[in-house]
Amino acid sequence: MRAEYREGERFERLTFTGETFYGCDFSDCVFADCTFEDCKLDHSVLTECQFLRCTVTNLKTTMSRAKFTDFENCTLNNIDWMSLQGDGAFADPIESLRDCRLKYNTFTEMNLTKFKFAGSVIQRSMFAKCNLVSADFEKCDLLDTEFFQCDMRKANFKEASGYKVDIFGCKLQDAKYSL
């Protein structure tokens, strides 16, 4: 798909495999029951879009960004979220995650202060050098998910399981854990 501008549109039950979205700008769009496998965002922007019951696997990006996107009941595999911050990194690529399943995701140097991951499944993923102050991971399945040099002060990990924390490199003051 090349050089498209779409605003306020709804896309349903679409499947893209190996597609490159070049110069595309999606604003306030809804993607429902869509699948994106091995796709690439190249010089593209997603702004305030919603993804409902979608699957996104092996997303690659070049000079692209996402701003304030919402994901609900989605499966998100092998995504490097920092690559979606674009230059400047002033806007968060993710506004919310609700009832999502993430595997092999990487969050690097992101500000996720007070972010609500609660109830999500985040497996075999990595948070590196992130600000997770007051983030909520309550009841998350975090199987083999690692936290490296993160600021996790006041984060909530009650009833979360499977995570690995770099206790010497992470700030953990007042974080809440279940024993």
What are these regions (language model features)?
Residues M1-L179:
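Tandem repeat scaffolds
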